[in-house]
A protein has these predicted regions:
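Second-shell loop/turn segments in exported
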Residues: 34-35, 51-62, 90-103
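Low-complexity, Gly/Ser/Thr/Pro-rich intrinsically disordered linker/tail segments
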Residues: 183-206
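Sec-dependent signal peptide recognition
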Residues: 1-9
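N-terminal signal peptide c-region/cleavage motif recognized by signal peptidases
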Residues: 13-16
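Hydrophobic/aromatic-rich core segments of domains that either
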Residues: 113-183
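Mid-length scaffold segments of soluble, non-membrane domains
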Residues: 69-124
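N-terminal, post-signal-peptide region of Sec/Tat-exported proteins
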Residues: 43-77
Length: 206
């Protein structure tokens, strides 16, 4: 019977590892004050795998990442109060489940790492969150990726891009911009436009 016990324990351990690989802790209520684990099903992640797998180059992968992050946040909103999150910090002021740029940069970095851990980012690697300061006191953070091909080029700095989900309502595509443009202040808050994706993965921008 001992072999049966080991078999059961081994199966449980494998299931736990698989479950962990499909889970992410999302932050909300500003400053990552609250964290909640959300779990993505195999079928949900398979949709994203197929969606990202079509990308033929880094430009296309960034375009598809924009929608993929929006979808992951929408699915997370089905298990947590972040469905109430709106672009910027004013449209959802005081709402439980609201997210500031710290919540977004932390959560989106974790979502990007989830995709990377599955091997679905072929043209980018996940970098540390970026930050910018405007008007002395306006500090803003964003998740960040760097292009693999450019980082491997001799003598060249890697091309970096922000993946900023803070600008949009929950479920909307994340804003993806060259880091230099973002540091110069690009990126506009959009709210009240409705979700691009609800329920299942849309498969293409609308």
């Amino acid at each position: 019977m001992r072999w049966l016990t080991f078999l059961v324990l081994g199966g449980l351990a494998s299931a736990a590892i698989a479950d962990s690989a499909n889970s992410v802790r999302v932050c909300y209520n500003y400053g990552c004050l609250v964290e909640q684990e959300v779990h993505y099903s195999d079928s949900q992640l398979a949709q994203l795998r197929d969606w990202l797998g079509v990308a033929r180059n880094a430009d296309e992968e960034r375009e598809r990442l924009s929608l993929a992050i929006g979808q992951l946040l929408a699915w997370a909103g089905q298990q947590s109060p972040i469905s109430a999150d709106r672009g910027g910090n004013f449209a959802d002021d005081g709402v439980y489940g609201r997210m500031d740029c710290i919540d977004h940069s932390t959560t989106t970095t974790r979502l990007l790492q989830l995709l990377a851990n599955h091997g679905w980012l072929l043209f980018h690697r996940v970098a540390e969150p970026a930050w910018r300061v405007r008007y002395l006191f306006e500090l803003h953070y964003s998740a960040q990726i760097e292009e693999i091909a450019s980082s491997q080029a001799e003598g060249g700095d890697p091309a970096r891009f922000v993946v900023d989900s803070w600008f949009r309502d929950n479920g909307r595509p994340a804003v993806v911009l060259p880091l230099a443009n973002w540091l110069d202040g690009e990126g506009q808050v959009e709210t009240g436009t409705g979700r691009v994706v609800t329920g299942g993965f849309a498969g293409s921008p609308r």
